[in-house]
């Protein structure tokens, strides 16, 4: 099976630090997984270790453009499994899951808050801001080291716009809406087309589809030319014609003409 080949991203895109760092066991998995993912052209989003029904280690990853296809997850899993087996960051058996961040994804980098401006977000502060720990509203981008949010439920006496310091954010996540679903589907389809194109798997156009020739003009074709009306023969002006005209003016008749 051919490995997916993400578009080569800028180094700064891959190296952009996360705002949220996991503690404990998750931090040990992060130290092993992040360099491997980065070498493959992916970014680590979040690692979650769950003890429900056995131990599950969920690693969220993405391309720098925010997408992550099934083929990407499979490739990352094959690369990470042997490395984690050697590093042995946990002293018990666990099940490894590699996934995309999902539609209602966590926002873990500064670029995430800029990319998803205009969408609904919910934020929980690690350090209370203006006496509040939870905020929900429309994401309005970033300003300096703060996140701009048009807060829901603000009273007439309150300014709905709040600036939340990034370093004080404990958890930030998009809220599922129709607009967010539509944008996520659009991003996913574009990423799939790009992947197929990079692997040379783009389907050929159907036989009846005509390829456009860039050398030819794309101006609308003109209809059939109308038939030209018959033209009268050009009048002749020989010496014989001039003599006949003079006789006609003088009232003379040429006896050589006619019956």
UniProtKB/Swiss-Prot annotation:
GO terms for cellular component: cytosol. Transmembrane segments: none annotated. Residues 198-259 are annotated as: Disordered. CDD domains: YlxS_C. It comes from the Bacteria. Required for maturation of 30S ribosomal subunits. It comes from Rhodopseudomonas palustris (strain TIE-1). This is Ribosome maturation factor RimP. Residues 243-253 have a biased composition (Basic and acidic residues). InterPro entries: Ribosome_maturation_RimP, RimP_C, RimP_C_sf, RimP_N, RimP_N_sf. The keyword Signal does not apply. Its main location: cytoplasm. GO terms for biological process: ribosomal small subunit assembly; translation. PANTHER family: RIBOSOME MATURATION FACTOR RIMP. It is found in: Cytoplasm. Keywords: Cytoplasm, Ribosome biogenesis. Belongs to the RimP family.
């Amino acid at each position: 099976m051919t490995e997916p080949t993400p578009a080569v991203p800028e180094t700064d895109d891959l190296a952009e630090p996360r705002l949220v760092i996991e503690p404990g066991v998750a931090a040990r998995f992060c130290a092993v997984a992040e360099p491997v993912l980065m070498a493959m052209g992916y970014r680590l989003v979040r690692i979650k270790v769950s003890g429900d029904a056995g131990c599950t280690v969920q690693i969220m990853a993405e391309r720098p453009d925010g997408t992550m296809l099934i083929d990407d997850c499979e490739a990352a899993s094959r690369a990470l499994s042997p490395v984690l087996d050697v590093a042995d960051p946990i002293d018990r058996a666990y099940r490894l899951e590699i996934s995309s961040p999902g539609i209602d994804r966590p926002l873990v980098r500064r670029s995430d808050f800029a990319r998803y401006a205009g969408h609904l977000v919910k934020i929980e502060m690690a350090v209370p801001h203006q006496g509040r720990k939870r905020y929900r509203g429309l994401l309005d981008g970033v300003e300096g080291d703060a996140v701009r949010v048009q807060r829901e439920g603000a009273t007439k006496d309150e300014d709905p716009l709040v600036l939340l310091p990034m370093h004080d954010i404990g958890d930030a996540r998009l809220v599922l809406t129709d607009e967010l679903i539509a944008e996520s589907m659009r991003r996913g389809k574009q990423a799939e087309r790009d992947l197929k194109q990079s692997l040379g798997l783009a389907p050929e156009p159907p036989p009846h589809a005509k390829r456009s020739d860039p050398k030819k003009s794309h101006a609308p074709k003109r209809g059939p030319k109308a038939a030209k009306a018959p033209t009268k023969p050009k009048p002749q002006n020989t010496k014989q014609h001039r003599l006949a005209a003079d006789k006609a003016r003088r009232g003379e008749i040429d006896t050589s003409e006619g019956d």
